[in-house]
Amino acid sequence: MSKISYDAIIIGAGFSGLYQLYKLRDNLKLNCRVLEKGSGIGGTWYWNRYPGARCDTESHAYTYFFSEEIFKEWEWSERYPGHAEIRKYLNYVSNKYSLKDDIQLDTEVISATFDEENNSWILKTKNDEIFKCKFLITAVGCISTTNIPNIKGLKKFNGDHYHT
């Protein structure tokens, strides 16, 4: 199976992944690809669309600062924006800078192995694709995988217990 090669691959198309794509592609002129597990961009804002989901950071701070143009053009409707407006903002930025041209949706990376002999990363996806890159950035966010702590004695505890 042939490997698709890029200078850099970014895993995740949320806030950080989109920012990395812009900086690496537009500023450093690297050949980049974002691999996103979901069917749309936005990261946590793509996955979490429940009623009332919103940002707990003020909108003026929850903004990209790499472009004064974006900062001036986009107007948030609320001090603490909801998930739909945040997704709309991310799509606006993505469209403005043609970021979607370098994003591959519905692509889950299942392994990333560093090839020391060739000084490169080899990535495999759930769709049986193989990618190769010199630089790998994991922009999967801190809430993409459940992390249940191993608490001594928890299995013997008979009461209710919760983890968030």
Protein language model annotation of sequence segments:
Residues 69-76, 82, 86, 140-164:
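Glycine-rich dinucleotide-binding loop and its adjacent helix/turn
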Residues 4-34:
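N-terminal Rossmann-like FAD-binding beta1-loop-alpha1 element of flavoenzymes
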Residues 39, 46-89:
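Glycine-rich active-site loop/strand segments that organize a redox cofactor
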Residues 76-144:
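Feature captures the FAD/FMN-dependent oxidoreductase FAD-binding
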Residues 1-6, 164:
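A short, basic/flexible loop-to-alpha-helix module at the beginning of a structural domain
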Residues 21-23, 46-47, 148-152:
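Short amphipathic alpha-helical segments
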Residues 29-31, 100, 158-159:
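A generic structural signal for alpha->beta connector loops
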Residues 34-43, 132-140:
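Carboxylate/His-rich catalytic cores and anion/metal-binding grooves
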